[in-house]
Amino acid sequence: IYSALFSWLSIKRQGGEWLLRIEDLDIQRCRREYADQLEDDLRWLGLIWDEGGSMGGDRGPYYQSERSDIYREHFVRLQEKGLIYPCFCSRADLRVASAPHASDGIAPYMATCRNLTDVERAAKAKERNPSYRFAMPDGEMMFSDGNYGRCKYDMQKECGDFVVCRADGNYAYQLAVVVDDALMGVTEVVRGCDLLS
């Protein structure tokens, strides 16, 4: 609610439109009744959105679970440009690889599968379905944050190559949210500060 309030206030002050997108990619934990309750809570607080959610609008669908074809199209584009690659690491493999860094809370993926040969990939594909990771380029990324000002991060070092499509074929939040923001014309994103750490 905190993020919703601040984004609503910011958008209304600027004369913009407040969009409600339901980020329900995790079908195990996200049920439609939760989204309905969120809408009821926002209405009760007087935070009325201009489009999205059950209200609909021109840039929908607004439920990410209904946008798989859109994500597939952009996934294929990334694949054609060589910006993603298959990863055959299991969760157990990743836990072992990050064990020395467990006290850090999050250890970036060490790009174990990034430079596999086609022969190695074909052999691993016989054993398990891969997830797909974005090949994060080296170098610093800079952006302006409304609260923290100019921010600079070495994304390869701090995040590593992140999953864009899980081994079960479901698209990851990291791909979906970027595609949706671009296609829906989102110009301001209000998130918790945990995403900056």
Language-model-derived ranges and their functions:
Residues 1-102, 193-197:
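N-terminal Rossmann-like or analogous alpha/beta NTP/dinucleotide-binding catalytic cores
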Residues 86, 91-197:
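Active-site cores that bind ATP or allylic diphosphates and position pyrophosphate for catalysis
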